[in-house]
Amino acid sequence: MILVVTLACLIAVVCCQCPTTDQGQISKVFKAYDIDGNNKISRVEGTMVFRDADLNRDGALDNNEFSSEWAFYHNDYYSPFFNVADRNHNGRIEFVEGNQGFDHFDKNRDNEISSWEFTQTWMETVRPSSRPIDF
């Protein structure tokens, strides 16, 4: 159930004002999705996050699938993340939209998101003066 939070961050945090810049919270989110504990989120782990969250197995996350996990982990902050992640505005987050978010976080393009990449991208995005980042 907790697995969709990183997907949310990977997809959406790069385009909106996040609810927190707290290092402890960022670390907690990262560790929840570093499934094998190697201090990196691989593309395989990102795919697992998406598939686990896709409860009806239709290849996309609807608002209910997204919000049930997001609300559990971040209370009421899921809505802006969903709206930004839904790049084509069809009310669903398709797998390709999830991959776009992953690519944005993977700064060195090695198909893994390090703790540093995750934290830096999150922090750059939530700065009050930051503009939305397109990916």
UniProtKB/Swiss-Prot annotation:
PROSITE patterns: EF_HAND_1, EF_HAND_2. Disulfide bonds: none annotated. Pfam families: EF-hand_5. GO terms for molecular function: calcium ion binding. It comes from the Eukaryota. One of its GO terms (cellular component) is extracellular region. Keywords: Calcium, Metal-binding, Repeat, Secreted, Signal. It is found in: Secreted. Its main location: secreted. Component of the acid-insoluble organic matrix of the calcified shell. The keyword Iron-sulfur does not apply. Transmembrane segments: none annotated. Residues 21-56, 93-128 form the EF-hand domain. Ca(2+) 1 binds at D34, D36, N38, K40, E45. Ca(2+) 2 binds at D106, N108, D110, E112, E117. Residues 1-16 form the signal peptide. This is Insoluble matrix shell protein 5.
